[in-house]
Amino acid sequence: MDASDWDERYAGADLVWSAGPNVWVRELCSPLTPGRALDVAAGEGRNAIWLVEQGWTVTAADFSPVAVSRIRDLAATRLDEDALRRLEAVVADATQPAPGTAYDLVLFSYLHLVREEWHRAVAAGVEAVAVGGRVLVVGHAQGNLTEGVGGPQDAAILLDPEDVLASVAGLPVAVELAQLRARDVEGEPRPALDTVVLLRRTEDAPAR
């Protein structure tokens, strides 16, 4: 789907995604000391707004202008004036250099791209994070197609933990966590299967 497709999807519903943060984002980001965060392909901003509520200063980026407008609208209903100053919503392509650098956290939550585009996106994310900062990748796993629920139905854009690790091979990161996890989905008889990978930037060198 291109930006216009997502514009149409976001324009046609009150909320495409839930208003609360992803369960894995909440679990893994809650222990982190708030700093500067970049939410890549932020959608309607559910994770970005939650991060702001936890004390982070967040850039929420999406290539859909309608999604970016949704982020601003949702933030206005959830955040006070001081918190709103810590949220910037921008139109940006995940496969291009990130909007800004030296982030303490770069988040990829259910960003599914063909492999070449994914490699560009994750390399840009690693380059944008400060030494000691984290890159968190959450997405639908390959097994979700046959054993899970929801998510894209195209195996070419789904990532298992080992696929994420292969995509960052040679980049200056250390692996803190790489797991396949089951996520309960309300109203569904079986869980969704998610890939969850947490990386830490290890050296001050450009991503390659």
What does each of the following model-derived ranges do?
Residues 113, 139-145, 181:
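Short "lid" loop at the C-terminus of a central beta-strand within the Rossmann-like core
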Residues 132-140:
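Conserved beta-strand signature within the Rossmann-like core of class I S-adenosyl-L-methionine
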Residues 184-208:
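Core SAM-dependent methyltransferase catalytic element
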